Design a protein with these regions (language model features):
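A short hydrophobic beta-strand segment most commonly corresponding to one strand
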Residues: 155-157, 210-223
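N-terminal twin-arginine translocation
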Residues: 14-19, 30-50
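Glycine- and acidic-residue-biased ligand/ion/polar-headgroup-sensing regions
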Residues: 153-164
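Conserved short histidine dyad/triad with adjacent acidic residue
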Residues: 134-149, 198-201
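N-terminal secretory signal peptides
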Residues: 1-15
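Short acidic-glycine-tyrosine-enriched beta hairpin
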Residues: 172-201
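Asparagine-centered strand-capping/turn motif at beta-strand->loop junctions
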Residues: 205-208
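A short, N-terminal "cap"/entry segment at the start of jelly-roll beta-barrel domains
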Residues: 46-130, 182-185, 244-265
């Protein structure tokens, strides 16, 4: 090989090395960008629903559980996915006209103020909804007091503020008591959600840790009771600081709304 050929080969190798380096850098940058998009949820944003699509989806799973096409636990899993992962919190706030709710909210010194939002019913939105809805407005230290539910499936999402949230599984009922077991004890901030049904996490209690604090709630009523004789749909107030039993169980006495708010409101 003469000097001319050696120089030519050296130049070709240098070009190949540079092209390989450029390709490697591009690949690394592409991978890094993809990792960044995933870590910042920019790709996940494509999976978010519009407010209209989201409301239809919540209505449809509500029909599903009402008509026993899906179980109550399946409804809980699906509704929590819709609340926490399928709509931006800002979109939900716009949907319920939260700015107006917050401006006009009249807080109470005990318990929570219940406000009924007006959801759209025209322009492609569901004309009627299988679920009811409300916003709870609370001062710091006030609570959605401990209570269980009959024939209901409900879901919550924190709109503003921070809460200490507790749930209990309803194991059985006695004449004057409900046997419960703690299932959730956690902090809940904006965008975080939980749910209840006759089958799972039936009792809940949320205490505001700052103010103003707001929770959005939906509820599907009149679900069939599969655990015993027919019972009236509604709330059942209890005192979760009842007698401690074996295996983490608590014998919680039934109390009325007044006593519940006196102690926990």
């Amino acid at each position: 090989m003469n000097d001319s050929d050696r120089i030519k080969e050296k130049n070709e190798n240098e070009i190949l090395r540079r092209n390989f380096t450029k390709g490697s850098v591009k690949t690394i940058l592409s991978i890094s960008l993809l990792e960044h998009l995933c870590s910042t949820d920019l790709l996940a944003a494509k999976d978010k629903y519009t407010a209209k699509k989201w409301l239809h989806a919540v209505h449809e799973i509500g029909l599903g559980v009402k008509e026993t096409k899906i179980s109550q636990i399946q409804w809980q899993k699906q509704v929590e996915e819709l609340f926490q992962n399928k709509i931006e919190l800002n979109e939900l706030l716009k949907l319920i006209n939260f700015d107006q709710i917050e401006k006009s909210a009249k807080f109470v010194d005990n318990g929570a103020r219940s406000i009924r939002p007006k959801l759209p019913r025209s322009n492609g939105y569901p004309k009627s909804l299988v679920f009811g809805s409300q916003v709870f407005a609370l001062k710091k230290g006030r609570s959605v007091v401990p209570h269980g539910h009959n024939n209901m499936a409900t879901a919550f999402i924190v709109l503003k503020g921070n809460f200490h949230g507790r749930h209990y599984d309803r194991i059985s009922d006695e004449k004057d008591h409900m046997i419960i077991r703690p299932s959730i004890d956690d902090k809940f901030g904006p965008g975080q959600t939980s749910s209840i049904s006759d089958e799972k996490d039936n009792v809940h209690w949320f205490k505001a840790e700052d103010e103003p604090a707001f929770i959005f709630n939906i509820h599907v009523l009149g679900l069939p009771n599969k655990k015993g004789p027919p019972r009236r749909t509604g709330r059942l107030y209890i005192d979760p600081e009842g007698e401690k039993l074996d295996n983490g169980l608590i014998r919680a006495p039934f109390i009325d709304s007044k006593k519940a708010h006196q102690k926990y409101g």
